[in-house]
C-alpha cells in the first residue's frame, strides 16, 4: 500500500518510524519497539498529543516490571520523555504510545512494553509535524523492510529481491 503524506509508518523489524512527506518522500527516525509478545501492529490514528506527559503504568506493566511507581510526573526521569502521541483505534485508546524516552541508548532495540520510543529530540520533531487524526500504520513482524524480509512499505510491499 502506498501511504499518503502525514501518515506515520512504523517498521518494527528495521526499528524505524517513517513520517510520510509529499511526493513519496519520508523522514526516518530510529526507534525502540515493543518485545514481540507485547507489540502492537495494524492501522490506527493519533487520538491525542501531549507535551511532557505524565506516566501511569497499566496493571500489566506493574506485574511485568515489578517495583515501579504508580505515577511518574513529567520531567527528565519520566520514561515517556518529552512528547507523546496517543494511538487510538476508532475512539478507543489502545494504551500504545509513540513517545520520547529517558533511555536513548536503547534506540534500535526491542525492549519496551509495546510503545514506540524515539529520542526526545526526534519525538519533539515528529510531534510538531503530526496532527491529531493522522493515520498510524504499524507493520506486523515480517512485513517490514529488514534484511530478513526485504519489502518496501511505500510501494505496496513489492519484493525487492
Q: Can you say where each PLM-predicted feature lies in the sequence?
A:
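Cell wall/extracellular polymer interaction/catalysis modules
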Residues: 1-60
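Exported/periplasmic cell-wall-interacting domains
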Residues: 3, 28, 37-38, 42-43, ...
Amino acid at each position: 500500500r502506498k501511504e499518503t503524506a502525514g501518515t506515520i509508518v512504523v517498521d518494527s523489524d528495521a526499528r524505524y518510524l517513517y513520517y510520510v512527506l509529499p511526493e513519496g518522500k519520508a523522514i526516518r527516525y530510529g526507534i525502540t519497539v515493543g518485545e514481540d509478545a507485547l507489540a502492537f501492529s495494524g492501522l490506527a490514528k493519533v487520538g491525542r498529543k501531549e507535551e511532557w506527559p505524565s506516566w501511569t503504568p497499566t496493571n500489566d506493566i506493574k506485574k511485568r516490571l515489578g517495583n515501579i511507581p504508580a505515577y511518574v510526573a513529567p520531567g527528565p526521569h519520566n520514561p515517556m520523555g518529552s512528547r507523546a502521541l496517543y494511538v487510538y483505534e476508532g475512539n478507543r485508546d489502545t494504551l500504545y504510545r509513540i513517545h520520547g524516552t529517558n533511555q536513548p541508548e536503547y534506540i534500535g532495540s526491542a525492549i519496551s512494553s509495546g510503545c514506540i520510543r524515539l529520542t526526545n529530540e526526534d519525538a519533539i520533531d515528529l510531534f510538531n509535524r503530526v496532527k491529531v487524526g493522522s493515520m498510524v500504520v504499524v507493520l506486523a513482524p515480517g512485513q517490514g523492510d529488514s534484511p530478513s524480509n526485504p519489502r518496501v512499505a511505500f510501494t505496496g510491499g513489492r519484493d525487492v529481491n
